[in-house]
Amino acid sequence: MFNLIRKSTEWGGKTLVLESGKIARQANGAVVVTYGGTTVLSTVVAGKAKEPVDFLPLTVQFVAKSYAVGKIPGGFLKREGKPSDRETLISRLIDRSIRPLFPSGFYDEVSIVCNLLSYDTVTPPEVTALIGATAALAISGVPFNGMVVGARVGYLLSEDKYLLNASADEMLSSSLDLFLSGNKDSVLMVESEASELSESQMLAAISFGHQNCQEVIKLIEEFREESGILPFGFIPHDITSLVDDIASSYTESFSIAYSNIVKKERVLELEKLRDQVLSDMLAKYEQPNGNLQCQYSSQDIISALKSFERSLVRSKIIETSSRIDGRAFNGIRDIEIEIDVLPKTHGSALFTRGNTQALVVTALGTPQDEQIVDDLDGDRRENFLLHYNFPPYAVGESAALRAPGRREIGHGKLAWKAIRYVLPEKSDFPYTIRVVSEITESDGSSSMATVCGASLALMDTGVPIKAPVAGIAMGLIKEGEKFIILSDILGDEDHLGDMDFKVAGTSSGITALQMDMKISGISIEVIEKSLLQAKDGRMHILDKMNLVIQESRECIKNHAPRIESIFINKDKIRNVIGSGGKNIREICEKTGARVEIMQDGTVMIYAINNDAVEYAKNMIMDIVSEPEIGKVFDGTVIEIVKFGAFVSFLGGKRGLIHISEIKNEHINAVGSVISVNDKVKVLVIGIDREYVQLSMRRVDQETGEPIDGELYNIRKTNSDSDDSFLSSGSVNNRHGSEKKRRGSGRSRRSSGGSSYHRDDLHNNGFGNGNRSFNDNRNGNEVPRKPRFF
């Protein structure tokens, strides 16, 4: 029933298995690839284009459903919705890897679906999916020039060791996360994020990955041979004579149009010429009865015109050593930079390079604003977001605004990778950071303008980044063995060239690298020269940026939110929260701040200004702090009794001010001096297992400063005497006669003096003429051990 084909090999320490003939047999090609514990079903279906087109209508979809990791989708429907960003990015990786290998002129619809069936959270699914897509194309009969395989490369800087298809845990210690694809002879695509690595380290990583792809390329070739399926015959439509016809009549006109350095004017001139060529060619080949004289259709004319323009611009660059806008091959367009361009945002920058412009804006939020990502590797939180928007007006088009597409998601992710390494640690800067790049003009390299603008906007915001980051896009014109590398390419140079090579980094090294090809790959030599030329361009751009701002502002804007983190003992978390959340609600209501408490004892305080942050922080510290002898605290009188007053301090702790510690003079009634709800400043003068003894008379009630002459070295004692209310606080354990203490104490109080003798101190902890509570000197009935709570 099944005609099984199976091939396997050991690769990167795991078993790689290709199998076909059992699942999805209605597709042109279907292969189940198992690599380690990850399984992907890749299918290819081809059909005639539904309408005439002059491009390859290739669609690639990577689908990762939650059952692959044994999960049920969240949400009400319990079913997967639109593709996640990760699915979109992997789809782009596969598309960019295989698109250059289809023959020129092949315009049939091709649909590739890579369905992740099982995922072990160790083996990279993008590697498995690309292998499956290539193997499925190889046995589908669709014309396809060569085998392409992808590999994920890591780098352990401390060991100078490169890793092949490492797990997510292993990549945590890696200074590089690079995915590349290549065929037998060359590299086709690179996507990477790095920690300021040098050009030589990046080149070695690319070479390492390409070499390790060869074993799998050989396996896929053997797999195709065993299947016995060959590509169906494809003969591209010959439009050579039509191209020559256009060239003979319009070379000079197009040369003049392409020499216009103003993009808007150049585009208008080229559009007029293209309309004229189409009209002239249709009229030339049309017969009186309306039928075409030969096989040339309007689509043929459009294809021929594109071929002519590509050849014209490329030959001009190579033969005359002159680019479209007259720059040298390594020349950078004029750069204009402004920061703080929007008054009420947390940070902003306007970066203009030639006719490419990015308005980049930052917004700071709290950790509660972090994006929760439901990923196959497990839920995670992102505190750095970068969104790239490319509206139609950026290229002078009239169209409706739509949701971000694959290109916008991909460009935003590249800029995100370029910036992420230089961001501060969350413990040092706990804000959630959102960067939005609005492309307001575009003539090539808008993603790299986003990188430059994001770096500038972050510094304007006051985010303490490690170093400024700049990006540059390189191009390639290759004819035979001759090639020219172009710095800071225009949109037309990107469209008509052979390579889009983007490099971003600091003055110390590369933080992101992306390469896309329009031909069947390039050699390591070309990549090396591109990296070195890109470094010169990156340094030039960084110099321009440094003229405007070299480092982050010392503080964030006044209208930006304030965040402060403090650490408390985990055992105190319940005290801060309070019964039913009472304490935390009270803090938020009184201060206007938001408070978030982590399980490790980290407390995050968010507010609109510093005063609110300090107020909330003080309230929290009051709750978690323990009374300390000799420290002054703010308190509130909560109860008046005959022998003193009870005071709430340190976030709800209760202490007692004995009547003799209220004022430095005799008082008949506590209520005549203080009342309930009075705010007082108190000094802790004694602590034992049951009581906290406080004093008002030893503290200046205006300034909160201890009064000179009223302090002494209080130390805790272990007196077991029932005649003393306190069991700590005295510096002298001598117990003089009651008569002596009473007499000396009265004389001092009546005279208001502040000079004392050590022998006058009783071990009750109040000192300075204070008597034992049981003296009942003021006529108050005081129990030996008053109830305290």
Swiss-Prot record:
Residues 630-697 form the S1 motif domain. It is found in: Cytoplasm. Residues 709-789 are annotated as: Disordered. GO terms for biological process: mRNA catabolic process; RNA processing. Keywords: Cytoplasm, Magnesium, Metal-binding, Nucleotidyltransferase, RNA-binding, Transferase. Its cofactor is Mg(2+). The keyword Metal-binding applies. PROSITE patterns: KH_TYPE_1, S1. GO terms for cellular component: cytosol. Its main location: cytoplasm. HAMAP family: PNPase. PANTHER family: POLYRIBONUCLEOTIDE NUCLEOTIDYLTRANSFERASE, POLYRIBONUCLEOTIDE NUCLEOTIDYLTRANSFERASE 1, MITOCHONDRIAL. Belongs to the polyribonucleotide nucleotidyltransferase family. This is Polyribonucleotide nucleotidyltransferase. It comes from Ehrlichia ruminantium (strain Gardel).
